[in-house]
Amino acid sequence: MNVVCHIRYEIDPHRRAAFEEYARNWLSIIPACGGELLGYFMPHEGTNNIAHAMIGFGSLAAYEAYRTRLKSDPAGKVNFEFAERERLILREERTFLRPVRK
């Protein structure tokens, strides 16, 4: 894993349970489409409207290929539509990170 896509979600705090369902759906979809899912993380203490996800890839090109597969994946389409219909995500930011190695 050379690149980590960190996704910061601003979510509706009154829709946390629905967002958690959305996140749980990705737990099988993302690996099936080629992402190395490090996890989805829900608010626990403190800020109640910020969630995170981290997904690893060998390269940015691998990320782009993953995004193409994800957009055509039937379960992925259903989950994207679920989030849109339920208005779970108010804002989404992606940052690409690299691991620090010895």
Predicted regions and their residues:
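Residues at or immediately preceding the N-termini of alpha-helices
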Residues: 15-16, 60
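Short, structured motif recognition centered on aromatic/hydrophobic residues
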Residues: 3-8, 19, 30, 51-54
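Short acidic/glycine-enriched loop/turn segments that link adjacent beta-strands
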Residues: 46-49
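Absolute protein N-terminus
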Residues: 1-2, 102
